[in-house]
């Protein structure tokens, strides 16, 4: 969770170099954050959105041309006692929060929660040896698979975008006129 007393740590972790103003260059930020913030017994989705909204505003203050992509949280389970886990509905609630933030900030969303199978899907990922026993985090192979899926989706969106651009008519090179006396 973003706290005021951790500003420098958060800035450096999420946006290295954020302290210097960069009003001209366009940067992209992918937010794949929030699973630990949402993996609590009582989840306040408004506070969740407000804290990430504050972080986004801080980034936009020094880098106004930044584009954002939000990665929704994954499905997760909550440990209630030793070796006893229950489905955690907060992933779905956090997912909706990311879509609301994306709408507000005209950002993209990669819906990891739905892609992995929605509520209850983390058990399948664990059974496939892609998730850790805590039923919150992934094993290396799971993170690599998700990274590959994200990359392919991003590249496909880019290729779709450039395919929709208007074709440019090639211009003939201008003849160079020599100044001869």
Annotated model-derived regions:
Residues 24-29, 63-68, 104-108:
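Loop/turn elements at helix/coil->beta-strand transitions in domains of secreted/extracellular proteins
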Residues 32-36, 58-92:
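Active-site segments of SGNH/GDSL-like serine hydrolases
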Residues 1-50, 137:
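Conserved SGNH/GDSL esterase-like catalytic core that processes O-acyl groups on lipids
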Residues 7-9, 35-40, 74-78, 115-119:
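Solvent-exposed loop/turn segments at secondary-structure junctions
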Residues 3, 32, 71, 94, ...:
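Generic beta-strand/beta-sheet core signal
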Residues 16-20, 58, 153:
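A generic secondary-structure signal
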Residues 52-57, 95, 99:
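Generic structural signal for well-ordered alpha-helices
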Residues 75-181:
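Catalytic His-Asp segment of secreted/periplasmic serine-dependent ester chemistry enzymes
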């Amino acid at each position: 969770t973003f706290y005021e007393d951790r500003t420098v740590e958060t800035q450096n972790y999420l946006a290295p170099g954020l302290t210097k103003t960069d009003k001209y260059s366009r940067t992209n930020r992918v937010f794949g954050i929030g699973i630990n913030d949402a993996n609590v017994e009582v989840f306040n989705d408004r506070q969740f959105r407000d804290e990430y909204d504050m972080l986004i505003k801080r980034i936009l203050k020094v880098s106004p041309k930044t584009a954002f992509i939000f990665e929704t949280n994954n499905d997760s389970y909550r440990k209630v006692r030793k070796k006893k886990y229950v489905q955690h509905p907060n992933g779905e609630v956090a997912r909706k929060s990311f879509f609301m933030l994306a709408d507000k900030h005209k950002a993209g969303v990669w819906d990891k929660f739905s892609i992995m199978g929605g509520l209850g899907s983390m058990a399948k990922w664990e059974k496939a040896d892609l998730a850790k026993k805590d039923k919150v985090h992934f094993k290396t192979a799971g993170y690599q698979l998700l990274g590959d899926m994200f990359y392919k989706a991003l590249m496909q969106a880019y290729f779709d975008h450039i395919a929709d651009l208007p074709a440019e008519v090639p211009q003939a090179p201008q003849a160079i006129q020599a100044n001869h006396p």
